[in-house]
Amino acid sequence: MNFGSLFDNTPGGGSTGARLLSGLSYGNHTAATNVLPGGAMAQAAAAASLFSPPLTKSVYASSGLSLALEQPERGTNRGEASMRNNNNVGGGGDTFDGSVNRRSREEEHESRSGSDNVEGISGEDQDAADKPPRKKRYHRHTPQQIQELESMFKECPHPDEKQRLELSKRLCLETRQVKFWFQNRRTQMKTQLERHENALLRQENDKLRAENMSIREAMRNPICTNCGGPAMLGDVSLEEHHLRIENARLKDELDRVCNLTGKFLGHHHNHHYNSSLELAVGTNNNGGHFAFPPDFGGGGGCLPPQQQQSTVINGIDQKSVLLELALTAMDELVKLAQSEEPLWVKSLDGERDELNQDEYMRTFSSTKPTGLATEASRTSGMVIINSLALVETLMDSNRWTEMFPCNVARATTTDVISGGMAGTINGALQLMNAELQVLSPLVPVRNVNFLRFCKQHAEGVWAVVDVSIDPVRENSGGAPVIRRLPSGCVVQDVSNGYSKVTWVEHAEYDENQIHQLYRPLLRSGLGFGSQRWLATLQRQCECLAILISSSVTSHDNTSITPGGRKSMLKLAQRMTFNFCSGISAPSVHNWSKLTVGNVDPDVRVMTRKSVDDPGEPPGIVLSAATSVWLPAAPQRLYDFLRNERMRCEWDILSNGGPMQEMAHITKGQDQGVSLLRSNAMNANQSSMLILQETCIDASGALVVYAPVDIPAMHVVMNGGDSSYVALLPSGFAVLPDGGIDGGGSGDGDQRPVGGGSLLTVAFQILVNNLPTAKLTVESVETVNNLISCTVQKIRAALQCES
């Protein structure tokens, strides 16, 4: 390497040479004398003789750029520089620290890189090896120029050509000087960051070295933990040695699990655990921690043993990942349930709390994926059920589906990570899959894979949290994008069998796949929000409380035996469940969607084959459903549809006349199960009755009915098995409109804000009693005309024609 003018007999060269000599090690003395000129060789030998300890840095370890950019100090000659360096090396008997000088030179160079400018030289572009040696002229910028450049750098570290030109004119600099200043400034920032990271790594390395040395020392001189004396070599068992290795591996894995959890939740959490890896789920009222025992995940709890084996994903134990995710989600749910303003604000109707998204992102360091809408709500209320019974219902996928038939189309438990502790459900953690629905063909079903985790915080206080385990992916025409953020409920026992339930729902979804008619409903939280879940829970628990009571209301038919009541209610439950599954096209009955050219695009037509199902007639089943907006309140629409005397206004099964209620079972206020008969029966309908179930709550209403045979219903009302009664349900789902305005559906209707209802009409019809028969276009058109005619009759009866 040719250092050119660095060793010239100029004042600048002498000073630089002296600095270079101060960095030479004794071992490189011979090599240095071979390249120095005669005048400098003597000084090099004199300087090297003063070095007491060998230095660690050689001249050949410095880059040509850093050597070339060393600025000479004015007013000093070679002798003064040499004397100064000699004093720094050995004067006063002090020990020389090579790293201190090396660090000071680097910092000095960095401090100049932002304010000094080498004419014609770029810190990123120059190639010292290809250019002939030459003297470098330095131009120090004025403080005003430096201030302007620094201010611009804070706003834009990478200015474009136009910005550099404007800056050069304003500061009276060449554009190349401005360009090189920014290049050098970026290099300086990068170097400082790397130095900081290196310092942290060095500290960590020093800690590991010290720990390694202490462990080695302990292995050389083992001490007995019982008596404190020296232990024999065989005292440390092989099993304990493996446990120590496993403990070290788990500590490393824990850090990776925390990082992976941040990807699921969209924000990062720093958890600090003690040496025993205690996994605390929170604190109880006494301030004590509640921790999982070592046998957590053993499956010895009260849940049925299902798939217990864990798999490994990317080298990380899946059970550890899911456990960390559940703990983080539980912590967030409890905070959301307990917090008030400014995190939560009251909705316009005052029925629920709405989440302040800005405050949420600040509180939980969350990042929202671009292109996704957010729905978040919180509702509290009293429910006639104790906390443990509710938690057990939520942790059982079948009972959960039965409790929320209009919300959950299908649910399965795919893996039980923990069945609880000490024979209880406390601490149960399981992986679930569910299809969540709104009863309309215009709202896609939400297929969600999520964790469900329950924990007892205190006596009579439980919490159940759900959190998605699917990362958000870009949707390319496939399944709807949905991410269920920490959601669930906190339940607290009060008195007389009641509980106070605080329900929180938080999700992110792709709004582009939702029909314009239903977007306001979902934004308001009435579609999948907390108000709907809590209202359904309150209605179902009220029904259960009435049914298990021994008293019979005056409106009920006393001729039905207790066994007949139970059998009839079970039949109505199956009818309602099949009705809901035929609207949103989940995978419960393997519906196949049809596309017919002359059918309205807002009408969903599906078909399936019914074979060997005693609860349905065999053959080809056709389902058709559509949703419309009506300028009528949900209560008014519900009262009209469930009134048997007004049924002749819209139902073709009534033969144009009123219907008579033969039997009734009350399930709550304005809801129950009825058995209807037409007063104008013809010869073909002499053996047919109508089974109808009606229910209503704050989130919506439901009217479901199905034709049934009279002989079969006699068996049911006497306590017989209802599973052999064949029926195909039809009916209506009524939802509040969510406060939509005149442009909500795009069909030109002018509608008042919040004054209407969203009506879903659905029919299931047997078009052919042969399962192998072909479905004809005429059958599809018949069902489509039936829906259109029914909607028009309802509009006319309510005097709300469009």
UniProtKB/Swiss-Prot annotation:
Composition skew (Basic and acidic residues), residue ranges: 103-113
Tissue: Expressed in roots, stems, leaves and floral buds.
Entries under PROSITE patterns matching the protein: HOMEOBOX_1 (PS00027), HOMEOBOX_2 (PS50071), START (PS50848)
Domain START: 315-546
GO CC annotation, single: nucleus
Keywords: Coiled coil, DNA-binding, Homeobox, Nucleus, Transcription, Transcription regulation
Top-rank lineage group of the source organism: Eukaryota
Any Pfam family: START
Region of interest: Disordered: 71-143
InterPro entries for the chain: GLABRA2/ANL2/PDF2/ATML1-like, HD, Homeobox_CS, Homeodomain-like_sf, START_lipid-bd_dom
Residue ranges of the annotated DNA-binding region, renumbered to this chain: 134-193
Coiled coil: 182-221
Compositional bias (Basic residues): 133-142
Subcellular location: Nucleus
Record flagged with keyword Chloroplast: no
Gene Ontology biological process: anthocyanin accumulation in tissues in response to UV light; cuticle hydrocarbon biosynthetic process; plant-type cell wall modification; root development; root hair cell differentiation
Presence of keyword Nucleus: yes
Phenotype of gene-disrupted mutants: Plants display a strong reduction of anthocyanin content on the adaxial side of rosette leaves, a slight reduction onf the abaxial side, and extra cells between cortical and epidermal layers in roots.
Example GO molecular function: DNA-binding transcription factor activity
Family note: Belongs to the HD-ZIP homeobox family. Class IV subfamily.
PANTHER family: HOMEOBOX-LEUCINE ZIPPER PROTEIN ANTHOCYANINLESS 2-RELATED, HOMEOBOX-LEUCINE ZIPPER PROTEIN MERISTEM L1
Known role: Probable transcription factor involved in the regulation of the tissue-specific accumulation of anthocyanins and in cellular organization of the primary root.
Record note on quaternary structure: Interacts with AIL7/PLT7, ANT, BBM and AIL1.
Protein name per its UniProtKB record: Homeobox-leucine zipper protein ANTHOCYANINLESS 2
Organism name: Arabidopsis thaliana (Mouse-ear cress)
Gene name, Swiss-Prot/TrEMBL: ANL2
